[in-house]
From Swiss-Prot:
A lipid is attached at C17 (N-palmitoyl cysteine). The gene is mltC. Its EC number is 4.2.2.n1. It is found in: Cell outer membrane. A lipid is attached at C17 (S-diacylglycerol cysteine). Pfam families: Mltc_N, SLT. InterPro entries: Lysozyme-like_dom_sf, Murein_transglycosylaseC, Murein_transglycosylaseC_N, Transglyc_AS, Transglycosylase_SLT_dom_1. It comes from the Bacteria. GO terms for molecular function: hydrolase activity, acting on glycosyl bonds; peptidoglycan lytic transglycosylase activity. Murein-degrading enzyme. May play a role in recycling of muropeptides during cell elongation and/or cell division. PANTHER family: MEMBRANE-BOUND LYTIC MUREIN TRANSGLYCOSYLASE C, SOLUBLE LYTIC MUREIN TRANSGLYCOSYLASE-RELATED. One of its GO terms (cellular component) is cell outer membrane. It comes from Escherichia coli O7:K1 (strain IAI39 / ExPEC). This is Membrane-bound lytic murein transglycosylase C.
Length: 359
């Protein structure tokens, strides 16, 4: 279980789509918004720590949906990488009732991230006729869960057969863990194939690359957020990639949070940025495979940092890359890029893209 402590939430600002600012420039409004977000995160983590203890601070991330309710006493945590759903409560009275409500709401919640505030304890989760987790979870009889009656029966089964407890030194934590189906990742990916194909045709970006980026960034979690306030399936930051894309489309300002939490808008914006990296920022790289490696790395760490691996002069950097084989470019970016995260990112996305190309 990932634990994000308050101090860890105040991260340095980089230059990328999923974690940083693009174009190597900063603006005052963006800095103010980022500082405000850091303050919000620090206060939110402090509130959690007051109830759960220092070692039990768990906050939503790119691949982790975490929602607190009951005045921070109950939380639902979906780990989209591991495929587990953990419902926990520290309620001192009727903990089973608190767990039951949270189990039912989590199983039946919709797929509209803009309607849910993951940074508060407000109970704003609504039951949907088309649950987001439908098909990704089955009950004790092996059936998918769409209706409240089946969710209620499954909750009762879980509380009777899988209820666990532990102490955090302050309170007793009661919990239930649900395993998602083995192919939960594919189930989620399938939801967005139509949107991916539309964006692929619109911007000329390979479907397999879009899917690989989505898997690596969010594990197809539409509720994805990050400590740098990257949002949605492709982890787009409003004031960086979002602003660049809007400018290229003749729009002023930056995309709103609700816009980027909309799956179709997020995929469109993220794909548009991939096209900008490929055609504009890194368009001087001739070999398409070498350019793809550079684009993938730049989506995480910024185009400027990619080129500086080869030369501080951008034109000279492209010229150097054009003298290298794609294999040498890959080797250089995965071993010499200054960011360990970006080095790993290229490996992860490239590996994921190969798997989607085989399908």
């Amino acid at each position: 279980m990932k634990k994000y402590l308050a101090l860890a939430l105040i991260a340095p600002l980089l230059i990328s789509c999923s974690t940083t600012k693009k174009g190597d420039t900063y603006n005052e409004a963006w800095v103010k918004d980022t500082n405000g977000f850091d303050i919000l995160m620090g206060q939110f983590a402090h509130n959690i720590e007051n109830f759960w203890g220092f070692k039990e601070v768990v906050i939503a991330g790119p691949k982790d949906y975490v929602k607190y309710t009951d005045q921070y006493q109950t939380r639902s945590h979906i780990n989209f990488d591991d495929g587990t759903i953990t419902i926990e409560t520290i309620a001192g009275t009727e903990p089973a009732a608190h767990l039951r409500r949270a189990i039912i709401k989590t199983l039946l919640m919709g797929d509209d991230p803009s309607s849910v505030d993951l940074y508060s304890d407000v109970d704003d989760i609504t039951i949907s006729k088309e649950p987001f987790l439908y098909g990704q979870v089955v009950d004790n009889t092996g059936q998918p869960i769409r209706w409240e009656g089946r969710a209620s029966n499954f909750a009762d089964y879980l509380l009777k057969n899988r209820l666990k407890s532990r102490s955090n030194g302050l309170r007793i934590i009661y919990s239930v863990t649900i395993n998602m189906v083995p192919n939960h990742l594919d189930k989620r990916a399938h939801k967005y194939l139509g949107m991916v194909r539309q964006a692929s045709r619109k911007y000329g970006v390979d479907e397999s690359l879009i899917l690989a980026i989505m898997q690596t960034e969010s594990s197809f979690n539409p509720y994805a957020v990050s400590r740098s306030d990257a949002l949605g399936l492709m982890q787009v930051v409003q004031h960086t990639a979002g602003k660049d894309v809007f400018r290229s489309q003749g729009k002023s300002g930056t995309p709103s949070r609700s816009f980027l939490f909309d799956p179709a808008s997020n995929i469109d914006t993220g794909t548009a940025y991939l096209a900008m990296l490929n055609n504009v920022y890194l368009g001087g790289i001739d070999n398409p495979t070498s350019r793809r490696y550079a684009v993938i790395t730049a989506y995480n760490g910024g185009a400027g940092s990619v080129l500086r691996v080869f030369s501080n002069d951008k034109i000279q950097a492209a010229n150097i890359i054009n003298t290298m084989t794609p294999g040498d470019v890959y080797q250089t970016l995965t071993t010499r890029h200054p960011s360990a995260e970006s080095r790993r990112y290229l490996y992860k996305v490239n590996t994921a893209q190969k798997s989607y190309r085989r399908r």
